Amino acid sequence: IGIGECSYLPKLNPEKLDTYESKVAEVCERINEHEFWLDKGLMGFPSIYFGLEIALLDLEKKGSKLLFDSDFSLSEQPIPINGLIWMGSFENMMQQVDEKIEAGFRCIKLKIGAIDFEKELHILKSIRKKSSEIELRVDANGAFPPAEALEKLKRLSEYNLHSIEQPIKQGFPATMNQLCKESPLPIALDEELIGKFTKQSKAETLENINPPYIILKPSLIGGIKGSKQWIELAEERHIKWWITSALESNIGLNVISQFVATTKNTMFQGLGTGKLYTNNIDSPLQVIGDEISYNKQLNWDLSGL
């Protein structure tokens, strides 16, 4: 048996929720047409594509959940990950920061744009007082009004940040391109990649914006195949990238982790979301400190599926 996962995030996934279950049912009923589904049949349904793609990979590997050969899959090489700070009150966010630093994280990512901007700057200043070595990333999720974005980027850059994800909403390539040119803080595209299903549209996005970084979420961009295409196009243009899970369970997280391990990308990846679950599937995946590893001494427990 091969097991996949379709991870749907409302307001992010391009699929429509009211037709989602019926599309999954259609794919299951016509599963023998998987070559069609993996060619053009699921264009516009990236998370369902990802679910089918990994189920077939797992079937090919006899249900072992070992889908890609790498030192990670052999339990020999962990993957460095960032610690994620969720948006909240100043006190709550600082508590999360202290916990991540104490746990040994060398890279911290903060969601910003929800509380007062001055308070968010104060949080960054407080982190920098605690450590000048920690790699700091911020994610605005498109929260900055275009007219204010450059000034905010300039102020953020005072805290020696690694990058900012999606400072303005997606869909304004000319404005984003100008920001990438003028910002003292490197910009990473995230939501901007969603909905680009053809190789041409992906290439045009990178050409028109020319960002320093892109962030890949397989469930939102067409699985492993879609991610590989983005990586190829980005590397041709000397654009760096990293991968982030989209709140998948350990089924999806396992595949994403194993895949990124084959790419030899040494950046901090966004693969620490499994701990957010209260009912996750027990698996060999382990997060110790700021690394995720595959511990072959542990077993998969699929009894709850």
Model-derived segments and their meaning:
Residues 167, 174-244:
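A beta-strand-loop signature enriched in Asp, Gly, Thr, and Trp
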Residues 67-71, 134, 163-167, 244-246:
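Flexible, glycine/charged-enriched surface loops at secondary-structure junctions
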Residues 90-92, 114-128, 144-148, 168-181, ...:
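Active-site-adjacent beta->alpha loops and helix N-cap segments on the catalytic face
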Residues 102-106, 130-133, 154-162, 178-187, ...:
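Glycine-enriched alpha-helix->loop->beta-strand junction motifs that scaffold or abut catalytic
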Residues 244-305:
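Flexible C-terminal active-site loop/helix
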Residues 1-136, 141-143, 157, 283-305:
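N-terminal capping/lid subdomain adjacent to the active-site entrance of alpha/beta enzymes
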Residues 88-100, 147-151, 195-207:
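Short, acidic/polar
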Residues 86, 106-116, 135-142, 160-172, ...:
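Catalytic beta/alpha-barrel core
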